[in-house]
């Protein structure tokens, strides 16, 4: 076999810190390679043969390899192995995604779509959030320091001391290759469940991508224009639609290859079936539950709240999320190096109190910024729309920010924002850093505060689970005046202002609850059409509010002092660089 051409390289900024500052670091590749592979061969650790088999089986053409910073040393060798191992007649092209627009745990569908890739191989740690567009294979890596027999001895001691109690075993992704060994030990024990993780995402598993690939190849049997789904030319002999649906009647048009009216009429047939395959994240099977991307298959007891959790691995964001989301349950952690199974004593109460404090700040905020930190997780767009409607219904103003990877300088540019709410994957949704000038809330916290609901101790980091609560009882009709009731701890005066006692500052906070922008536009259009007189009271009220807001600002910009600055002749300034000016005393 002749050597294949070298792979195309596509990389973004290789920043090595969370704030995207580029730092030059010398890396010992051999030492890094030895530490990460930890006794496995290169092919075993990166599962090269499995990836090649999937590529050939599904006839993928453009493959994107997404690697985190700590695995970039393997990018060239990895891409060459895949490129050279697939026969030339398949005509594959391999790209390397060196860094992501957001967190490295999320699949970078944005960059991959720019490359028009049809398959992504995600290496390293993953949040396992459901995707919406492209099939993905997860390669987690491996570690050899876990001994299944030693773990079973410690677990048996715990189970013996806590009879009649149920346990669910979670594990770090690096120990996924040990999962079957653990399952074989406890498959006959109804009180112990071992979670399972699939190495492929939801798009690959439901095979929805195959319909798209089939139709791209067939191009609707070449009987339609190139823009098949938008074409008005219909062929009565074709029973195959662009959405992959089949019509039992060969004389009828099907799928998307119809006129605009026919597309609208049959949207719930072919196209809607494809849509449900892509964005449905709910599990209709009562015997299963999905937690942090891990599937739990229940045996007897089906209430997850009646289980204790066991975590195998080091401290991680996944463990933190389990502790926060299931704060009423016992969580045990197996310390691999010490061979001990101990109850995890993370100060959950303190963390929950901090999150409740941020939730109270949401009530005091007048302007709320929605920070988008993912463009690939399912229902992110619907969640943003729901947050905007909830904020507007509460008499506040929402602004949406897409700033890429989150850091302090980016958000510091928007001083008018009172508080931010972040839409991110469940592992990156809690931002507890004190470096940010304004607090960052989660969709769950914002929904809890703006609806003035009593907090029961429940906490949800996955906005996919928050979304049904977000749109619950929320009117989508902007003309509905009763869509947002005044909470019990707030009072509305004659001018429409809401008086709220802040538990954070201990003061009365006054917020103006004016009509939404959409309502004002609709009323203005109706007034212009009817020719009635226009009231300008609201306009003066808006000007008054803006003036009051500016008067409370401590910094109002540079003072021009026109006509007050004395005129002087030009003088010699400083020369050199900021590190060492020529006019410094040490250089004289």
Swiss-Prot record:
Low complexity bias spans: 11-28
Any one GO BP annotation for this protein: protein histidyl modification to diphthamide
UniProt keyword annotations, A-Z: Iron, Iron-sulfur, Metal-binding
Binding residue positions for [4Fe-4S] cluster: 106, 127, 425
GO molecular function: 2-(3-amino-3-carboxypropyl)histidine synthase activity; 4 iron, 4 sulfur cluster binding; metal ion binding
Cofactor-binding details, from the entry: Binds 1 [4Fe-4S] cluster per subunit. The cluster facilitates the reduction of the catalytic iron-sulfur cluster in the dph1 subunit.
Pathway stated in the Swiss-Prot or TrEMBL entry: Protein modification; peptidyl-diphthamide biosynthesis
Cofactor(s) listed in the protein's UniProt record: [4Fe-4S] cluster
Top-level taxon of the source organism: Eukaryota
Disordered: annotated segments: 1-28
Cellular component, GO, one term: 2-(3-amino-3-carboxypropyl)histidine synthase complex
UniProt keyword Aminoacyl-tRNA synthetase, yes or no: no
NCBIfam families: diphth2_R, DPH2
Function text: Required for the first step of diphthamide biosynthesis, a post-translational modification of histidine which occurs in elongation factor 2. Dph1 and dph2 transfer a 3-amino-3-carboxypropyl (ACP) group from S-adenosyl-L-methionine (SAM) to a histidine residue, the reaction is assisted by a reduction system comprising dph3 and a NADH-dependent reductase. Facilitates the reduction of the catalytic iron-sulfur cluster found in the dph1 subunit.
Family, similarity comment: Belongs to the DPH1/DPH2 family. DPH2 subfamily.
Subunit structure: Component of the 2-(3-amino-3-carboxypropyl)histidine synthase complex composed of dph1, dph2, dph3 and a NADH-dependent reductase.
Protein name as catalogued: 2-(3-amino-3-carboxypropyl)histidine synthase subunit 2
UniProt source species: Dictyostelium discoideum (Social amoeba)
